[in-house]
Curated annotation (Swiss-Prot):
Cytoskeletal protein that is involved in cell-shape control through regulation of the length of the long axis. The keyword Secreted does not apply. Residues 154-241 are annotated as: Disordered. Residues 1-111 are cytoplasmic. InterPro entries: Bact_Cytoskel_RodZ, Cro/C1-type_HTH, Lambda_DNA-bd_dom_sf, RodZ, RodZ-like_C. Signal peptide: none annotated. Residues 176-211, 219-241 have a biased composition (Low complexity). This is Cytoskeleton protein RodZ. GO terms for molecular function: DNA binding. One of its GO terms (biological process) is regulation of cell shape. It holds the Pfam family RodZ_C. The chain crosses the membrane at residues 112-132. It is found in: Cell inner membrane.
């Protein structure tokens, strides 16, 4: 009878009351239980007061109660009916899974975005290529036009100026012919003093030509003596006339490593050169500075002005027709 009464009394007590009584019989405080179970004191207090914290899942609460029962030596089977009331199992709220259609829609949207990105990239690349091709084509047309113009100008100059060098040589030969025949009257010895006076003057003015005439004509020793005395004085004068002039400090020197169209104009507007230069060709131009240059292929020419190389790298990098002006720089006094 006493056993049944005790069992009925235990069933009447709640889970929290039974755990609190068992704890008090063991002489433990709520703080000690909380430290052993690694719980907060407030959680132990809620368990003993049969409270279910709203922020604590029922699964965790049932686990805490079982740990508390093992600590105070209370059989878990006796607490099961009370656990169902104090901490009933609640279905966990599970977020609804995204439907397959939503994932498919998002994937489709990402595909459209990627396609649009590639389309924009292709358009940019295409526009860049078209712009480069137009510039390249325009440069080639400009070079061809300038080459045709220069060829036509060179042909016109050749047709109109072929007689110029011939006239110069004829004039030179005409100037030398009288000079060679002039000393003949001055050779006789028995001429009067009046006729002998102009002979040195004629010989002095035409001393550059007397020497050849004396070398070619075999005359008598008496008649050749006056001319022979004048010959040594004529040699230095003729040698000085043949000596090369000093180099122009404003000379423009160009060496070509490939075929290149070129046009050079000086300060007066005179075209010093206009046409095509072949590989391994050289040009040495002199005019009035500054010079204006148009070069179809800057990479094919090396320019020196006033003894210094001219930098054409900016035109070579952009592959453009070079248009530049070379200004005259003051030369140091010698």
């Amino acid at each position: 009878m006493n056993t049944e009464a005790t069992h009925d009394q235990n069933e009447a007590q709640t889970t929290g009351v039974r755990l609190r009584n068992a704890r008090e019989q063991l002489g433990l405080s709520q703080q000690a239980v909380a430290e052993r179970l690694c719980l907060k004191v407030s959680t132990v207090r809620d368990i003993e007061e049969d409270k279910a914290p709203s922020d604590l899942a029922s699964t965790f609460l049932r686990g805490y109660i079982r740990s508390y029962a093992r600590l105070v030596h209370v059989p878990e089977e006796e607490l099961l009916p009370g656990l169902e009331k104090q901490a009933p199992l609640r279905a966990a709220k599970v977020a609804p899974m995204q439907s397959f259609s939503l994932g498919k829609r998002r994937k489709k949207r990402d595909g459209w975005l990627m396609s649009f990105t590639w389309l924009v990239l292709f358009v940019v690349v295409g526009l860049t290529g078209a712009w480069w091709w137009q510039n390249h084509k325009a440069q080639q047309e400009e070079i061809t036009t300038m080459a045709d113009q220069s060829t036509a100008e060179l042909n016109a100059d050749k047709d109109s100026g072929q007689s110029v060098p011939l006239d110069t040589r004829d004039a030179t030969s005409q100037d030398t012919t009288p000079a060679q025949t002039a000393p003949a009257p001055a050779t006789p010895v028995d001429s009067t003093a009046a006729t002998q006076t102009p002979a040195p003057t004629a010989a002095a003015t035409q001393n550059t030509v007397v020497a050849p005439s004396q070398a070619n004509v075999d005359t008598a020793a008496t008649s050749a003596a006056p001319a022979a005395t004048e010959t040594p004085s004529a040699l230095p004068t003729s040698q000085a006339g043949v000596a090369a002039p000093a180099a122009d400090p404003n000379a423009l020197v160009m060496n070509f490593t490939a075929d290149c169209w070129l046009e050079v104009t000086d300060a007066t507007g005179k075209k010093l050169f206009s046409g095509m230069q072949r590989k391994d060709g050289n040009l040495n131009l002199t005019g009035q500075a500054p010079y204006k240059l148009k070069i179809g292929a800057p990479a094919a020419v090396q320019i020196q002005y006033q003894g210094k190389p001219v930098d054409l790298s900016r035109f070579i990098r952009t592959n453009q027709v070079a248009r530049l002006t070379l200004n005259a720089e003051p030369t140091p006094a010698q």
